[in-house]
Amino acid sequence: MAIKERIGVVVSDKMDKTVVVAVSNRVPHKKYGKIVGQTRRYKAHDEENACHVGDRVRIRESRPLSRTKRWAVTDVLVAANRP
């Protein structure tokens, strides 16, 4: 099975070595066919604490690292503007 990858935005970086990444997806409604937006939040491992809120990142599936963490940050695509 191929390793899954997602691109999303960091919405929380308050945990040590962990970030919460929101991944948006547009899918058709099952019955009515209207295109609706879905957002899924993944906890991802950030070894160097390099990610901050607002960063656009790529995450990939990994082995379970904790009870809820099964993704890891591979790279920061666009860094957020920080003062």
Curated annotation (Swiss-Prot):
Report whether Acetylation shows up as a keyword of the record.
no
Query: PROSITE patterns, alphabetically?
Result: RIBOSOMAL_S17
Kindly state which keywords UniProt assigns to this record, in alphabetical order: Ribonucleoprotein, Ribosomal protein, RNA-binding, rRNA-binding
Among CDD domains, the record links this protein to: Ribosomal_uS17
- Asked if the keyword Nucleotidyltransferase belongs to this entry, the reply reads no
Instruction: Provide one Gene Ontology biological process annotation.
Output: translation
Q: Name one GO molecular function term.
A: rRNA binding
Q: Name one GO cellular component term.
A: cytosolic small ribosomal subunit
Q: Which domain of life is it from?
A: Bacteria
Q: Which Gene3D superfamilies match?
A: Nucleic acid-binding proteins (2.40.50.140)
Q: How does it assemble?
A: Part of the 30S ribosomal subunit.
User: Entry's PANTHER family?
Assistant: 40S RIBOSOMAL PROTEIN S11 FAMILY MEMBER (PTHR10744), SMALL RIBOSOMAL SUBUNIT PROTEIN US17M (PTHR10744:SF1)
What family, per the record?
A: Belongs to the universal ribosomal protein uS17 family.
What job does the chain carry out?
One of the primary rRNA binding proteins, it binds specifically to the 5'-end of 16S ribosomal RNA.
Name of the protein: Small ribosomal subunit protein uS17
- What organism, scientifically named, is this protein from? Acaryochloris marina (strain MBIC 11017)
- Taxonomic lineage of the native organism: Bacteria, Bacillati, Cyanobacteriota, Cyanophyceae, Acaryochloridales
